[in-house]
């Protein structure tokens, strides 16, 4: 059974089994880095199955949504709290920012809320992680371009 989170009253889309729904770019980069490091150390690509590929496509989709080129995207987060670093203003979407193809993140890797949504180190981490996905999928699936991730 799924444990009910202490954060179940957060004003976001909470589901059973989710502890907390704060989202940071690095949270999606680490599974990629782990996959890539494992593959480089072992040469074993058997772990890159359909479930792994589905997860990678979801990561790419999330990064694209959070570029916010076509609106705010589906993610928002609010919490009733006295701590400013624990919540996100303006309906849970954060302060306005001009879209520029960087990925928005309302939280830093420390779980503290951001004021400015474009965390350059986190975006660099994402670029590196996306390059690792490309290298793996070119090797395993013979993917040649970005269109393969849209299927």
Located regions from the model:
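Aromatic-rich carbohydrate-recognition surfaces in CAZymes
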Residues: 1-85
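Acidic/His metal-coordination segments adjacent to aromatic residues that form catalytic metal sites
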Residues: 2-22, 83-118
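Short, contiguous, pocket-lining structural segments
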Residues: 23, 27, 48-55, 95, ...
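Catalytic cores of carbohydrate-active enzymes
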Residues: 61-81, 115-119, 125-151
């Amino acid at each position: 059974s799924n444990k009910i989170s202490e954060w179940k009253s957060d004003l976001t889309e909470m589901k059973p089994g989710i502890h907390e729904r704060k989202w940071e770019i690095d949270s999606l980069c680490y599974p990629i880095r782990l996959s890539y490091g494992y593959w480089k150390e072992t040469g074993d690509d058997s772990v890159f199955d359909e479930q792994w590929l589905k997860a990678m496509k979801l990561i790419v989709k999330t990064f694209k949504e959070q570029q916010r080129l076509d609106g705010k995207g589906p993610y928002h987060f609010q919490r009733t709290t006295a701590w400013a670093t624990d919540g996100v203003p303006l309906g849970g979407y954060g302060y306005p920012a001009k879209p520029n193809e960087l990925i928005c993140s309302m939280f830093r890797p420390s779980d503290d809320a951001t004021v400015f949504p474009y965390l350059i180190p986190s975006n660099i981490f994402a670029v590196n992680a996306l390059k690792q996905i490309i290298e793996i999928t070119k090797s395993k699936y013979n993917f040649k371009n970005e269109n393969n991730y849209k299927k």
